[in-house]
Every structure is written in structure tokens, then in C-alpha cells.
Amino acid sequence: SWVSKLHGSKPGIPANVSLMYPTGNRTWGEAGTGGFIGNSHAPMGLVDKDPNARAKSMTLQGMSLDRLMDREALRASMDRLKARIDTTGQMEGLDTYNQQALEILADGNLAAALDVSQEHPSVVERYGINDPKYQRDGAPKMIRNFLVARRLVEAGARVVSLNYSRWDWHGGDGLNFPRSREEFPLLDQGLSALITDLHERGLQNDVSIVMWGEFGRTPKINKMNSRDHWPKANFAFVAGGGMNLGQVIGATDKHGNEPIERPVRFQEVFATLYHNLGIDLSSATVEDASGRPHFLVDPGIKPIRELVG
């Protein structure tokens, strides 16, 4: 949402896109909101169990562009009357949504970006096969959304978020390690395909990738042959963005208990992404509803020097 506010969007392509599927555990399936910045900068959700259906819903479906514009003119005249009696500011947000929807229908670039059938079959095959079945309270294994994310960025989206499968394995079934052997190779296939794709298309310096979760796993194995939640130490994988890659930054003790060398904060990762997007963290601010400016990260937080120094 910060990036959408500061950089704006291209006509017909939302700046902030979510390919995150709603999940039984609600927090795993949300890409956030616009907060005080406004709903017009919230992520636009573009997921559907049928990947082809989402593209079709963004085309005119037999209606001429002239007829669409006539309908838009009528709607706008009615909304102007509503806006005169609106004291909440909600109409302004709706106007932004309506304009964005109109641009999407008229432009067609978003629908084209979502249509992976336009890709060469060998490229699609590289990413693996989607499994639309929901993984208990987690997301489905829509591995080709890595490809959709690349197409969206090429079309002009600035930020794309996605979720994949389910990783909360420390319950009573004792299948933590069997699931690891199943899930990690599939994730590796989609992620490595995306990185390879970006290099082949000359985008490796223009697109930044971050893969992470909100916490790590316990050094000790519990009585159910699984590892529990562990907030003391975590990891993130980054690629692209013209960064200095091929290195491990920081270290934990020998048990993986907590950092003992170069701990990295979450906000440092965000600062690095903002830096890669050309945002000056020393001066970029966004005002809240009262006009008070907010910096994007806390004072003293800088991009990860090992990556961008």
C-alpha cells in the first residue's frame, strides 16, 4: 500500500496485487489492507479456483467500448449527486474503484497478464502443476501463480503477494517431516522457475523476490515428532533486485535457538525492498487522515548493507 501511494499505478494495472487465497486460518490468506492510506491502495485480490475465469471477468464480454463509456457517464452523473450528501469520504474511495475497474475493462492488459495460455508450453511446464485443493486451513498449491506474478509485474504491477500451501505441521498427526519432503521440492520448483524466468527475460535486476514466514521453528522436536512455533529466530530468502546475492547473512547458535551474529530485523527487509524500488527512506512520507506524516520504517532502519551496499 505504501508503494501504491508513492508510485501510483499504471492505467489498467493495479499497483498492489494479491494472489493470496482465503484460508481457514484467516491471517494466512490476507495480504493486508490500505489502512489509513485508503482502500484505493489496498491489494486487489485476483485469485480464483479457475485461473481462466479470472481473466474472462476482466474483459468486455461482447459489450462495445462505446457502450461501456456511455454507462460510465450515466453512473458518474448519479455519483456526483451522492457525493454531495456524503460526509464519510467513502464515495471518493468508490470513485477510485470504479475508475480502476473501467480502466481494466477498457485496457485488457490485466486480463492478458492473467492468461498463462499465452506462454510457451515449456515455460508453463517448468513451474509445475496447480493443485486447487485447499490444504486443511491453508492455501491450495497453485504453483503456477509464480508465473502469474511474473506476468503481472511485466504488465506494470509494482507489488504482488502470493501464498502457497500450508506450513503449520506441528499438530498431532506426526507428519511434519514427511510433509517437508513433499512440500519443499514443489516450492523449490516454482520459486526456481520464477528466478530462472526473470534471468532469461533480463528482469533479474528489476524485480525483487522475498520468501518468508512470520516465525521460525523450535530447535527441539516435540513429542509429536514435529517442530513448534519459534519467534526467536527465522529466515528469509531474497533474490533479484540487482542485489549482492549468493551469501548467508547472520547466524544462529549451533542449536538454531537465537541469532548470535548479524541479526536482521523484518523492517530491514522492507527497507531493502523500498530501496530497490527507488524510494528514498530519508524523505518519503505518507500522511494520515489528520495530515501527520509517517515514514515507511522506524528511525535508524536502513536497507541491508550486505545486499545493497
Predicted region positions:
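Ligand-binding pockets and gating/stacking loops
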Residues: 1-309
